[in-house]
Structure formats: C-alpha cells, structure tokens
A protein has these predicted regions:
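Extended, low-complexity, acidic/polar intrinsically disordered regions
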Residues: 1-292
Length: 292
C-alpha cells in the first residue's frame, strides 16, 4: 500500500526540470505566490489517497525519520503530508519532529530535496497550522533564507511556502519571526525584500482595522511599524517600494500617526520624517507589492 504513495514522489520528479514561467514581477496583491502554487499542486497530484490503517503508515514514516537519511526522510515527509490531509490529529503530537526533519532537508545540497522540503512545509502550514516553538521559528527562518538562494526555483518554492504561511498562520506568529535577524535584519537584500512583500500581504489580507483594533495586537503592530520604518531607508529598491506602499495603506487609519510615533524610536522617526510627510500628502493608491 505504501508503495503506491511513493509513486507520487517519483511522478513529482519531472516537475523539477523547470520553474513556473510566470514573471516574478506580475504577482497579484491578493495572492503574491501567483502560479508558483501550480508546481506544488502537481507535486502532490496523487495525494488524495486513502489509508486503510493511517496509524501504521505514520509509524513507518516515523521510523524512516529516525534513520536520518535524506532520501528516507523525504519519502516519510510526503507520507506525513498525505496523512495530515486525512487525519491531521494523528500528526499534532509529532509536529516538532516533523518540522526539524523539514529543516534538515532545507540544509541539503540537492536542489530537488530542498524544493520538496519547501513544498512539504507549505502543505503542513495549510493542514496543521502548527506554531510550536522553537521549531516553527527555525523553519520559517530557513524558508526566509532560501528566498535569497541562487537557485531561482528554490526561491520560488520558498516564497510560495511563506505565502501559504501568511494565509493559514496567525499574523502575530508570522510577524514575530519576520522581525528577527532571520528576516527584517537579514544581510541578504532578497530576504529583506521578501519580508517587506510578506508584511504588505499580511496587512492587506488581515485588514488595517484588525491591526489597530485591540490591545492584543499591540506587539504585532509595533513590530510592523518598526519594520516599515527601517525598510523605508533600506538599500534595496524593492524593499523601499514595498515599505512605501504599506505605510500609505496604514496611513488610512486615523490612529496611525499617534501610534506610529509611540511605537517607533524617535531617532528613527526623525530619519524618515520627510518620507512620511511625502507619503501622507501623496495621491492615494492601492497597496502595490513588488514581488519576488
């Protein structure tokens, strides 16, 4: 029975020969991942399989994970994805192990292994929505790092996984990891551009009013403001453009100015004061995302 599951993995190898042909500068605001998700759908085209005994399939997958061999780990994670779609409650208790295994594949030197790890991460963000720390933080940090990879296909898959994270994981968890040195403080400009794009997308998706609505979002709002302020003076033009777009969106709320100056360091606000004034009196426009 398990042999038939591995045929889905063998079938998926063909999709590694080329990336999505969609231009990286033509992603929509509503779904920045664009056509990248088509690759993932092909990769799990045969995922809708029924297990007669999913518990036994899970035990076998765990044994493969313990072997700590990249090929067995990859096959085990694909099986776990299948199980998570049928009986996600079986996977809950082992998600820390699963996320650590995904991270181990993300460190692999083989591009097809890394791409599979990105796609597995995306599927588990969708089905499990697990935010247990520190494994969740480690996984998101590694996916962010892969958005700066030299391999274009890996960049696309990592971005698609992060798009799925933004769709299914609470904003507070996403923003917390993105605000660290693995995200907004990363030395790679491509990673910072990804963070600015995701930040724009998350605020657009959740709504500006939600960000300003309750005291429960105070920490998240503060992180968003600080990242916006730093991105306005970033050395990367895409990062700056995304930050300007996001600040203009945030300025539509009546409490923005008061709360922004309350949460952001005074020296930083003075540094970007001219830009804030320009954005405030600039002609209003929709949120525009410079994509990966």
């Amino acid at each position: 029975m398990l042999a038939c599951l591995y045929t889905s993995f063998e079938h998926s190898n063909s999709v590694y020969t080329e990336c999505s042909r969609t231009s990286l500068n033509q992603k929509s605001v509503l779904y920045p991942g664009g056509d990248n998700m088509k690759l993932q759908e092909k990769n799990y085209a045969t995922a809708a399989l029924n297990f007669e005994r999913p518990q036994d399939a899970l035990k076998l997958a765990l044994l493969k994970l313990k072997e700590n061999q990249w090929d067995n780990t990859m096959q085990a994670l694909i099986d776990i994805v299948h199980i998570s779609r049928l009986q996600p409650e079986l996977i809950d208790s082992i998600m820390p192990i699963v996320n650590r295994s995904i991270c181990s594949l993300l460190r692999n030197i083989r591009s097809n292994v890394v791409r599979t790890a990105c796609q597995v991460a995306a599927e588990l963000f969708r089905t499990m929505q697990c935010t247990q720390r520190p494994e969740f933080d480690e996984l998101v940090g590694m996916l962010l790092q892969k958005t700066g990879d030299m391999n274009r296909c890996i960049r696309q898959d990592a971005n698609s996984a992060l798009d799925t994270m933004a769709d299914f994981i609470p904003a507070s968890h996403c923003v917390r990891v993105m605000s660290t040195s693995r995200g907004a403080g990363h030395k790679n400009p491509l990673v910072r551009a990804t963070v600015s794009r995701l930040l724009n997308y998350i605020v657009t998706l959740k709504g500006v009013d939600t960000l300003f609505s309750t005291t429960a979002t105070k920490d998240t709002r503060g992180r968003v403001f600080i990242m916006c302020a730093k991105f306005l003076v970033d050395g990367n033009c895409e990062t700056r453009a995304n930050a300007r777009s996001l600040v203009k969106l945030l300025m539509t709320h009546s409490d923005f100015e008061h709360l922004f100056h309350q949460d952001v360091d005074r020296k930083l606000t003075e540094k970007i004061q001219k830009q804030l004034i320009t954005l405030k009196y600039d002609a209003p426009s929709g949120s525009r995302i410079i994509s990966k």
